[in-house]
C-alpha cells in the first residue's frame, strides 16, 4: 500500500485524503520500514504537498495523539520553526500575555528546531515543569488558564519517524504538521510558517480541520511570526472563510526594527529576554511580542478592534499581570 502510494507520488500524482490517511496510519502504527518512510517523505516533498495531503496527515496525527478535552475553547500560538533565524521565543512569551488577558492558552511545543532555544527549553529554564501527564496539563489549564503540551509526551507515534527525519536532514511534511495537531484541538490558532507559499494552503487546512478562527502568518524577513522588521503576510480564517492581507508595524504606531534586534540566544539568554519583557523593558522585542499577542486577542474577542487589543496586551505587561501569570503557571506545574 505504501509502495503504491510512493509510485503515485513519484509520478507526480496527488493522493486523495483517504489514501493519504491509509499511508499515514501505517507509518504512525509502526507498520512501515525506514526506507519506505524516507521515500514517502522525500517524494512528497519533491512533488509538493497538497492541501488534501496535509489535511489527511494532520487528521491522523490528531487521532493518534493523547488528547485533552477542555470544556471551553482554547488558543494556540505556535510556529513551524525552520526559519533558521534564531529569534527569541516570541510565541512562548506572548502566551503569558494572552492568558493574562483571559484567553485560555494550550501552548503546543517542543525543544529547539530552528534556534538555540525552543519553547520547551525556555519554559524549563524559567522553572516550569514541562514533563506532565495529559491529566495534569488539563488540570493546570482549568486552574491557571494556560498549559504547555510537550509534543513528545502527546505524540508518541512520532517515534516511528524520528530516526528517518534526523537522517534525512531536510524539511518534510512533519515540519508543518506539529502546529496543526494540537492535542487540545485548539479552536483559535496563530500559526507562523517559514515560507510565504504555505500561508494560504495552511489556512485552507485549518478550515478543513474545523478551526473557528486562525491567522497564518509569515514575515517578509523570513520570520515564522508577525514581525516588526518588515511586512507580514496574513491569511485569516474566520468560520470557514479566508481573507488574505498584509500588515506593517507602522499601521499600529510601532517602530520598525532591524531583524538583528529580534535575535535570541541560549535558553539562559532567552530567559533573561523573557523576564525583561515581562518586567516592562521597552524596545523592539517587547513590541513584537505585543503585536503577536494583540492579534491573538483580536481573534478571540469578537467585539474588539486590533488597536484595542494592542493596548490590552501592553497593559498586561505594564500591570505585571503577564508576569504574575508566569509565576502562577510555574507554581501550578509543580503542585498539580
From Swiss-Prot:
GO function terms (MF aspect): anthranilate phosphoribosyltransferase activity; magnesium ion binding
One record GO biological process: L-tryptophan biosynthetic process
Positions with a binding annotation for anthranilate 2: 165
Protein's pathway: Amino-acid biosynthesis; L-tryptophan biosynthesis; L-tryptophan from chorismate: step 2/5
Top-level lineage group: Bacteria
EC number: 2.4.2.18
Binding-site residues for anthranilate 1, renumbered to this chain: 79, 110
Pfam families, A to Z: Glycos_trans_3N, Glycos_transf_3
Keywords for the protein's UniProt record, in alphabetical order: Amino-acid biosynthesis, Aromatic amino acid biosynthesis, Glycosyltransferase, Magnesium, Metal-binding, Transferase, Tryptophan biosynthesis
Cofactor section: Mg(2+)
Cofactor info, note text: Binds 2 magnesium ions per monomer.
GO CC list: cytosol
Residue positions binding 5-phospho-alpha-D-ribose 1-diphosphate: 79, 82-83, 87, 89-92, 107-115, 119
List of residues binding Mg(2+) 2: 224-225
Top-level class of the enzyme under EC nomenclature: transferase
Record's catalysed reaction(s): N-(5-phospho-beta-D-ribosyl)anthranilate + diphosphate = 5-phospho-alpha-D-ribose 1-diphosphate + anthranilate
InterPro entries for the chain: Anthranilate_Pribosyl_Tfrase, Glycosyl_Trfase_fam3, Glycosyl_Trfase_fam3_N_dom, Glycosyl_Trfase_fam3_N_dom_sf, Nuc_phospho_transferase
Binding site for Mg(2+) 1: 91, 225
Function description: Catalyzes the transfer of the phosphoribosyl group of 5-phosphorylribose-1-pyrophosphate (PRPP) to anthranilate to yield N-(5'-phosphoribosyl)-anthranilate (PRA).
Subunit structure: Homodimer.
Family label: Belongs to the anthranilate phosphoribosyltransferase family.
Protein name (Swiss-Prot/TrEMBL): Anthranilate phosphoribosyltransferase
Gene source species: Endomicrobium trichonymphae
Phylogenetic placement of the source organism: Bacteria, Pseudomonadati, Elusimicrobiota, Endomicrobiia, Endomicrobiales
